[in-house]
């Protein structure tokens, strides 16, 4: 049921704190998010 949601949330909050880093990382976060979703789709019912 929990498909690694906690990690995603943590990243988002950290991003809010460091707004400068957010712009640089945004593209990588999106990529990682998509990759993780594909992996999680196999595990989760």
UniProtKB/Swiss-Prot annotation:
Residue segments, region Disordered: 1-26
Tissue specificity annotation: Testis.
Keywords (A to Z) from UniProt: Chromosome, Developmental protein, Differentiation, DNA condensation, DNA-binding, Nucleosome core, Nucleus, Spermatogenesis
Name used for this protein in its record: Protamine Z2
Protein's GO biological process: cell differentiation; chromosome condensation; spermatogenesis
A GO CC term attached to the entry: nucleosome
Keyword DNA-binding in annotation: yes
Composition bias, Basic residues: 1-23
MF terms in GO: DNA binding
Cellular localization per UniProt: Nucleus; Chromosome
Organism: Scyliorhinus canicula
Function: Protamines substitute for histones in the chromatin of sperm during the haploid phase of spermatogenesis. They compact sperm DNA into a highly condensed, stable and inactive complex.
Domain of life per record: Eukaryota
């Amino acid at each position: 049921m929990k498909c690694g949601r906690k990690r995603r949330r943590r990243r988002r909050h950290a991003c809010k704190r460091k707004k400068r880093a957010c712009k640089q990382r945004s593209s990588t976060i999106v990529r990682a998010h998509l990759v993780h979703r594909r992996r999680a789709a196999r595990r989760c019912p």
